[in-house]
Amino acid sequence: MREAYLRCWIFSWKNVWVRPCQRLHFKTVLLQGSLLYTALDSYSTVQAAPKSSSGSVKFQGLAETGIMKMDMEDADMTLWTEAEFEEKCTYIVNDHPWDSGADGGTSVQAEASLPRNLLFKYAANNSKEVIGVVSKEYIPKGTRFGPLIGEVYTNDTVPKNANRKYFWRIYSREEFHHFIDGFNEEKSNWMRYVNPAHSAREQNLAACQNGMNIYFYTIKPIPANQELLVWYCRDFAERLHYPYPGELTVINLTQTESNPKQYSSEKNELYPKSVPKREYSVKEILKLDSNPSKRKDIYRSNISPFTLEKDMDGFRKNGSPDMPFYPRVVYPIRAPLPEDFLKASLAYGMERPTYITHSPLPSSTTPSPPASSSPEQSLKSSSPHSSPGNTVSPLAPGLPEHRDSYSYLNVSYGSEGLGSYPGYAPAPHLPPAFIPSYNAHYPKFLLPPYGISSNGLSTMNNINGINNFSLFPRLYPVYSNLLSGSSLPHPMLNPASLPSSLPTDGARRLLPPEHPKEVLIPAPHSAFSLTGAAASMKDESSPPSGSPTAGTAATSEHVVQPKATSSVMAAPSTDGAMNLIKNKRNMTGYKTLPYPLKKQNGKIKYECNVCAKTFGQLSNLKVHLRVHSGERPFKCQTCNKGFTQLAHLQKHYLVHTGEKPHECQVCHKRFSSTSNLKTHLRLHSGEKPYQCKVCPAKFTQFVHLKLHKRLHTRERPHKCAQCHKSYIHLCSLKVHLKGNCPAGPAAGLPLEDLTRINEEIERFDISDNADRLEDMEDSVDVTSMVEKEILAVVRKEKEETSLKVSLQRNMGNGLLSSGCSLYESSDLSLMKLPHSNPLPLVPVKVKQETVEPMDP
């Protein structure tokens, strides 16, 4: 028989068939059995029929040119790339097939999909609560589990109230593609229960992305009854900007070797073996930290902070607190701060603890589900997400015994951590991205990274760059205005209490003022309106004028009070700040407008009192009022051009970048906006939707129709101040004033020539070419071009007149016959009206009669 079949029964793995593989010089060492099989010159692939078992493990040899070595004990798989994991995988473990009707529907897919060589770890108090996954028997190195199963969400389809604890990111060409959510046990598999590893020593699984799936690979042999703990492989961690497993080991060794005796004593003190580990409250941690000397020399390692920049993918446009965009959770590398650091008389310049900032997903003060989430989530939340024995602070991975001591760090607003600071509360109207997490331990050490000068004033001068505060280069220009300028103090800083210099190391910090006040921050995406301004101000005044004012900011002590887009202008008060959230009944909504609104069919009619234009929403009316007031709060930092809406400014950016993302599929011409492309497509289709109601003329653009209507209305807005001539188009007036005005001082031509030139100017002014050229005036010098053409026409006429006079002299006075070549080209002559006639110069055709000679 030409094919050589090789079937190996591994006695330590029951009911397992090993797939024969095509190999040349094949050698394998059977684990635990130490059995050596060698097959030479076997070139054909032989496929064995595997048994129907969810835990079936299929053997795959490592392809090498010569002798294939199956012994990987010396390989350091933590340094492998995702491609190496996929290529050198030895065993493949498939999920147990799940049938909802097989067991009467008593188990969910996440539990029923567990392979037979694994077991669930249940909580002691609740036998049905899964808190981890352990091995049932020996699992060799190089075994692959997976793929991970869950619900798939793109960045735009994530539910508003989604629990991101079990989110896994999938990348395509180094760019974020979608999420896999394992939260729903009915739609996920057993891999959702695997807990994350917190050090390289405990890690035995590496998470890799192969294609668009997530797999778990064993990077070391796993004995029976050992828990499976996973962390990202090197490539995956690099995409997420997370530390490699080796870096976790460095942190572990640095922290444990500093003082092992003190480390072990605190371990026994904080976590007695007889008491289950649990989450500590802020009060308990303060009690444990009452003796600062105990923690004096612990965690002295200086680890450079890193920021998870790629987590910006989770930002929601509506600023939902469910998906915060920027870092909110701060993890201390050292032990919790001693009480000496918490005193109000803390001197500046004292040694500060180093913080590592992350872009977290929503944290919760309540205990998380016992089963583990993705390692990504474990870095973003310090609350325990696995079993009580695995509640670990992700940034102290080498200290699993101290993991609960940082559980207070994810206390959110309105909870115990922030409430413990008397008299201080964050402004509720701040966008979620601007609100860092606070707690009772170090609210004084959190400062936003503003550049602070010696007098305590903000030194930021760039709105679009925002230099140090480089979070919102374009999304929040109004907020940036409040931070720019050296004369504007930061709204939440007291200049008297600021030091001469403060560090701007990139950590998110914020100092509460000595006398806390509520601060006004304008909304990022809409016009700033004083909804309820008078309700929280003692003094108010409004100007008699009814036009909106520019959206700038003023200061009174430490209170920022921006002007409104409506005409209501409230005088700042030194006693309190305006609060846009707490509105009073007598000052809400449309009542902030400078004029009353009418009602139509019982509904408020949002009508402009200037042009009587109506709108469906109050916000649209407020934006429209800027057109009449001239307010343009959104400025381009390149050309300083102003816009009434943020969307217009963002569209304007394409002018400077030269980007033309929209392409015509007919002629492949590119445009910067969809509106320009839509107008261009009318040239190919011949569509002219704008028709004149007076004449049959049609136009592709409304502006052309608007200019055409002037021909019927005789509207001539452009007038010469010297000779009182008027024109429809501005370019016609410019040609007239360019040395062609008979009453002007710069006129250097004879009056007859000037009269003829002005006749041609008027003829051009009423033509359709003038309408088209006026649209091109920004890119072409229309005035010079028109003047050149008119002078050429006049010059040609003068030459023809000279030729006519010359022929008359040669042939005699009035002896021109009908056969004369001068009139052969046209049997009609042109009679011109005098230039003083206010009517347009329309050519009048008169038939030329034959001149006969008179008798003597």
Curated annotation (Swiss-Prot):
The keyword Repressor applies. There is a cross-link at residue 847 (Glycyl lysine isopeptide (Lys-Gly) (interchain with G-Cter in SUMO1)). Residues 558-605 are annotated as: Interaction with PIAS1. InterPro entries: PRDM1, PRDM1_PR-SET, SET_dom, SET_dom_sf, Zinc_finger, Znf_C2H2_sf, Znf_C2H2_type. Residues 115-233 form the SET domain. Residues 357-399, 532-571 are annotated as: Disordered. There is a cross-link at residue 847 (Glycyl lysine isopeptide (Lys-Gly) (interchain with G-Cter in SUMO2)). Expressed in bone marrow macrophages (at protein level). Expressed in innate lymphocytes, including tissue-resident conventional natural killer (cNK) cells in liver. Expressed also weakly in tissue-resident natural killer (trNK) and natural killer T (NKT) cells in liver. It comes from the Eukaryota. Residues 373-393, 542-556 have a biased composition (Low complexity). Disruption phenotype: Early embryonic lethality. Compound heterozygotes display germ cell defects and a rudimentary or missing fifth digit of the forelimb. Conditional knockout in lymphocyte T cells show a weak reduction in tissue-resident memory T (Trm) cell population maintenance in the skin, gut, liver and kidney but not of splenic T cells. Double knockouts for PRDM1/BLIMP1 and ZNF683 result in a strong inhibition of Trm cell population maintenance but not of circulating memory cells. One of its GO terms (molecular function) is histone methyltransferase binding. Its EC number is 2.1.1.-. It is found in: Nucleus; Cytoplasm. A zinc finger (C2H2-type) spans 606-628, 634-656, 662-684, 690-712. Sumoylation at Lys-847 by PIAS1 increases transcriptional repressor activity, and is critical for plasma cell differentiation. Can be sumoylated with SUMO1 and SUMO2 by PML. Degradation of the wild-type protein mostly depends upon sumoylation, rather than ubiquitination. Desumoylated by SENP1 and SENP6. Ubiquitinated by SCF(FBXO11), leading to its degradation by the proteasome. Induction: By lymphokines, specifically IL-2 and IL-5. Up-regulated during dendritic cell maturation. GO terms for cellular component: cytoplasm; nucleolus; nucleoplasm; nucleus. One of its GO terms (biological process) is coronary vasculature development. Keywords: Adaptive immunity, Cytoplasm, Developmental protein, DNA-binding, Immunity, Innate immunity, Isopeptide bond, Metal-binding, Methyltransferase, Nucleus, Repeat, Repressor, S-adenosyl-L-methionine, Transcription, Transcription regulation, Transferase, Ubl conjugation, Zinc, Zinc-finger. Interacts with PRMT5. Interacts with FBXO10. Interacts with FBXO11. Interacts with multiple nuclear sumoylation E3 ligases, including CBX4, PIAS1, PIAS2, PIAS3, PIAS4, PML and RNF4, but not RANBP2. Interacts with LDB1, SMARCD3 and SMARCC1. Interacts with EEIG1; following TNFSF11/RANKL stimulation in bone marrow-derived macrophages, the interaction promotes the binding of PRDM1/BLIMP1 to the gene promoter of IRF8. Transcription factor that mediates a transcriptional program in various innate and adaptive immune tissue-resident lymphocyte T cell types such as tissue-resident memory T (Trm), natural killer (trNK) and natural killer T (NKT) cells and negatively regulates gene expression of proteins that promote the egress of tissue-resident T-cell populations from non-lymphoid organs. Belongs to the class V-like SAM-binding methyltransferase superfamily. This is PR domain zinc finger protein 1.
